[in-house]
């Protein structure tokens, strides 16, 4: 088949595979467009879980007649125009592909009117070339998008839709998340002609706890501790539930936003859990609704097809900032619940200095020379839209990072000479659920950790190996097999073929599927941790190992595979280390309580401190 340019409709349908996963994905993209248009009221009508109809009506600025056709074209957007705009995104949408992708897998109609126009115009795309037809229509200022018969022309995608109830529950969850992000917008959601959700806009300065309680429940509201934390270009606002009263139902409430964009970020979750670890049980999770605001130049939102994840340029600073903010609130132990009425409430008590409120940092204390001037300033209420799109944001932020981070972690100067601490073996507490805070990377593959004033070194390759072993070891159900795009065919000896046949059931539990004939074996599927490995080398070595065994236990095979996997990281970064430890603490909590040999080594600072004191 010769190389050729794909037809526009087919190209859009391929793009829709990433953008449009299910009806909830359509709702998310369209509602975010309404918010970017400045809408203060959004009405969402759903029929049959979104498979039949999705209608989004807003009172935003609208789209001009001359731009309606462009709105349905690929890579057409009003939100960015240059690389500089892409590196400092403040809008929710920016790629200009959502409407084109949605219209290629549904019957989409776009009706809009601007305040300057006397009449509205309606546009829709059809045919193989996605030609856009524009005609006059009746419509107030704003935009209405109707998506009919989602996936009508892609039966393979349509058959993967779940039940009507399940799909609507996903839509409902998306609306809940958006309603928590924008308290200033009225949002109405109806299903099959019945109003299901009504979130009224909260006036500026009004009580946002009513909407918080409507979405997260009264139980969360009663245990919620308000956070207002600011340092430099970083601001953290929101609520975190008191860990002492967290229940399994509350633990499902985990909403995080970065510059108003809903996120699922492991670095942020790890920082929050680390701050709550002393008060949470082994099987408990923190409950929170948090809003992080950061200079847009310091965060990359263009790293995930559905924009569910971000990448921070200064991940260490962000992680420790969130950790200190949550920890300070928990240490204050506010006992008064959030108000349930509209009576004026006293202003929250200001926090004089980040580091003091969060407790002493024993690691930074020897370097402290003088107190740091308070830098906390009151900030607007959580969840509100930024007043200005970072007019003073400059790329020079990185040059200031060292000074900002030093001030964030510095402690006031001691009033009297400190005595050198007695030597002791730093050990993790029996009820600890965290290795501690990552300070830096040493010798490219070791993480320097701090916990309760104790310093230790953790071997990242060893932690990665233990994590892979847990991921490969089957539990109550076999490990999920990932089919290979191109099956691997290898020549084997009679002895190796016999060993493979004996180990077939054990390998199947590990997610390894193969088929053998006279002199060859064809590997058809492997578990996820093996997908990025060089299978041309690993599989023959695995076959050689199995040929020497007489008993085939899945656990032993998983252990051998984990020891022989090549690491994906030759040079570890702070973000990679924090992500790895978050996964290890979640999947391998026993390693935190009883670290095996070669994983964790305590560092005794006593000789160095004593040498400094004796000088």
UniProtKB/Swiss-Prot annotation:
GO terms for cellular component: mismatch repair complex. Signal peptide: none annotated. Gene3D superfamilies: 3.30.230.10, Histidine kinase-like ATPase, C-terminal domain, MutL, C-terminal domain, dimerisation subdomain, MutL, C-terminal domain, regulatory subdomain. The keyword Transferase does not apply. Keywords: DNA damage, DNA repair. It comes from the Bacteria. Residues 364-391 have a biased composition (Low complexity). Residues 363-397 are annotated as: Disordered. The keyword Repeat does not apply. One of its GO terms (molecular function) is mismatched DNA binding. GO terms for biological process: mismatch repair. Belongs to the DNA mismatch repair MutL/HexB family. This protein is involved in the repair of mismatches in DNA. It is required for dam-dependent methyl-directed DNA mismatch repair. May act as a 'molecular matchmaker', a protein that promotes the formation of a stable complex between two or more DNA-binding proteins in an ATP-dependent manner without itself being part of a final effector complex. This is DNA mismatch repair protein MutL. It comes from Shigella boydii serotype 18 (strain CDC 3083-94 / BS512). The lineage of its organism: Bacteria, Pseudomonadati, Pseudomonadota, Gammaproteobacteria, Enterobacterales.
């Amino acid at each position: 088949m010769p190389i050729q340019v794909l037809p526009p409709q087919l190209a859009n349908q391929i793009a829709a595979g990433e953008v449009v996963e299910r009806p909830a994905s359509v709702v998310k993209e369209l509602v975010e467009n309404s918010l970017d248009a400045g809408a203060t009221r959004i009405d969402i009508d759903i029929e049959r879980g979104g498979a039949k109809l999705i209608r989004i009506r807003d009172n935003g600025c609208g789209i001009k007649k001359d731009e309606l056709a462009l709105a349905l074209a690929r890579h057409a957007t009003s939100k960015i125009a240059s690389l500089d705009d892409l590196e400092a995104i403040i809008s929710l949408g920016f790629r200009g592909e959502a409407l084109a992708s949605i219209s290629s897998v549904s019957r989409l109609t776009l009706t809009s009117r601007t305040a300057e126009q006397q009449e509205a115009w309606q546009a829709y795309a059809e045919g193989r070339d996605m030609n856009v037809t524009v005609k006059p229509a009746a419509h107030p200022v704003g935009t209405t998008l109707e998506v009919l018969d989602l996936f009508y022309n892609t039966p393979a995608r349509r058959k993967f839709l779940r039940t009507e109830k399940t799909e609507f529950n996903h839509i409902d969850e998306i609306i809940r998340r958006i309603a928590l992000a924008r308290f200033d917008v009225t949002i109405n959601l109806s299903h099959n002609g019945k109003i299901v959700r009504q979130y009224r806009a909260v006036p500026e300065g009004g009580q946002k706890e009513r909407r918080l309680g409507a979405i997260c429940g009264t139980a969360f509201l009663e245990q919620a501790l308000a956070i207002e934390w600011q340092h430099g270009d970083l601001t953290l606002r929101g609520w975190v539930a008191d860990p002492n009263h967290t229940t399994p139902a509350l633990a499902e409430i985990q909403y995080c936003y970065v510059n108003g964009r809903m996120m699922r970020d492991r670095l942020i979750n790890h920082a929050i859990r680390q701050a709550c670890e002393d008060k949470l049980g082994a099987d408990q999770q923190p409950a929170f609704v948090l809003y992080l605001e950061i200079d847009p130049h310091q965060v990359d939102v263009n790293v995930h097809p559905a924009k569910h994840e971000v990448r921070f340029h200064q991940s260490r600073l962000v992680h420790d900032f969130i950790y200190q903010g949550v920890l300070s609130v928990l240490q204050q132990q506010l006992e008064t619940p959030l108000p349930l009425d509209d009576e004026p409430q006293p202003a929250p008590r200001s926090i004089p200095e980040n580091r003091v409120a969060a407790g002493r940092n024993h690691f930074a204390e020897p370097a402290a020379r003088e107190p740091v001037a308070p830098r906390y300033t009151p900030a607007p209420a959580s969840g509100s839209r930024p007043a200005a799109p970072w007019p003073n944001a400059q790329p020079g932020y990185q040059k200031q990072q060292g000074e900002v981070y030093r001030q964030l972690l510095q402690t006031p100067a001691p009033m009297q000479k400190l005595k050198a601490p007695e030597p002791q073996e730093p050990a993790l507490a029996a009820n600890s659920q965290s290795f501690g805070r990552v300070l830096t990377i040493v010798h490219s593959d070791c993480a320097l950790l701090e916990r309760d004033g104790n310093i230790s070194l953790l071997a990242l390759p060893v932690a990665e190996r233990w994590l892979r072993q847990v991921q490969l070891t089957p539990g109550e159900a076999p490990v999920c097999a990932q089919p290979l795009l191109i099956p691997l065919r290898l020549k084997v000896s009679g002895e190796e073929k016999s060993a493979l046949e004996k180990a077939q059931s054990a390998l199947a539990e590990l997610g390894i599927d193969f088929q053998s004939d006279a002199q060859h074996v064809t590997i058809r599927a492997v578990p996820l941790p093996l997908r990025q490995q060089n299978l041309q080398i690993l599989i023959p070595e695995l076959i050689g190992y199995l040929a020497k065994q007489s008993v085939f236990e899945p656990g032993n095979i998983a252990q051998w595979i984990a020891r022989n996997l090549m690491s994906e990281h030759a040079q570890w970064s702070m973000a990679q280390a924090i992500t790895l430890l978050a996964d290890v603490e979640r999947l391998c909590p026993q390693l935190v309580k009883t670290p095996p040999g070669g994983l964790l080594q305590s560092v005794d600072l006593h000789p160095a401190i004593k040498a400094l004191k004796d000088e």
